Amino acid sequence: MDKFVKLTGVAAPLPVVNIDTDMIIPKDYLKTIKRTGLGTGLFAEARYNEDGTPNPDFVLNKPAYQNAKILVAGDNFGCGSSREHAPWALLDFGIRCVISTSFADIFYNNCFKNGILPIVVSQEDLDKLMDDASRGSNAILTVDLEAQEITGPDGGSIKFEVDAFKRHCLLNGLDDIGLTLEKGGSIDNYEKATAASRPWA
């Protein structure tokens, strides 16, 4: 998993509440267990017309936001079914950070496990960030996980809180396997001690 220390990039505004995982990645894309390639299905029902052509009115199809790294979204983002394909699709598109006033718990935790930083802010701060994100190609935000701070295009900053353990994992690029490997020495010592004390086992 890639480390997340500081991210600077275009932020796309998506001022819609209750965006569920089916909206993020429709069920037609759930047949694969590969994490790559799902970016094409991200927000597919809103992003494409019925004939498969891009919907020019959808934010991620607009030239200024086609390479967005940050998503500023409405309340209760990621609700619905607990499909891990949702963060996979966001990540494959190139989005490493989602900012909202609240997230569904399972989606929130899945983001951390897949290298995405979900940030909870107040409605007042979200309104400011949504305004910043509406500037098109000038909608540049910097998200500093070490400082726990978001800096807008005008230099104004917003502080945010994140669980210390989850922060440690993202800063060091540790998924569940990485966490286990980080404790490799302790595991080896335990196995050796157990083998010495229980030679019959």
UniProtKB/Swiss-Prot annotation:
Subunit note: Heterodimer of LeuC and LeuD.
Pathway(s) per entry: Amino-acid biosynthesis; L-leucine biosynthesis; L-leucine from 3-methyl-2-oxobutanoate: step 2/4
Gene Ontology molecular function, alphabetical: 3-isopropylmalate dehydratase activity
InterPro entries in the record: 3-IsopropMal_deHydase_ssu (IPR004431), Aconitase/3IPM_dehydase_swvl (IPR015928), AconitaseA/IPMdHydase_ssu_swvl (IPR000573), IPMI_Swivel (IPR033940), LeuD (IPR050075)
Record key words, sorted: Amino-acid biosynthesis, Branched-chain amino acid biosynthesis, Leucine biosynthesis, Lyase
Gene: leuD
Annotated catalysed reactions: (2R,3S)-3-isopropylmalate = (2S)-2-isopropylmalate
Family to which the UniProt record says this protein belongs: Belongs to the LeuD family. LeuD type 1 subfamily.
Protein name, entry field: 3-isopropylmalate dehydratase small subunit
PANTHER family per record: 3-ISOPROPYLMALATE DEHYDRATASE SMALL SUBUNIT, 3-ISOPROPYLMALATE DEHYDRATASE SMALL SUBUNIT 2-RELATED-RELATED
Enzyme Commission identifier(s): 4.2.1.33
Entry superkingdom: Bacteria
GO CC list: 3-isopropylmalate dehydratase complex
NCBIfam families xrefs: leuD, PRK01641.1
One Pfam assignment: Aconitase_C
Functional description taken from the UniProt entry: Catalyzes the isomerization between 2-isopropylmalate and 3-isopropylmalate, via the formation of 2-isopropylmaleate.
A Gene Ontology BP annotation from the UniProt entry: L-leucine biosynthetic process
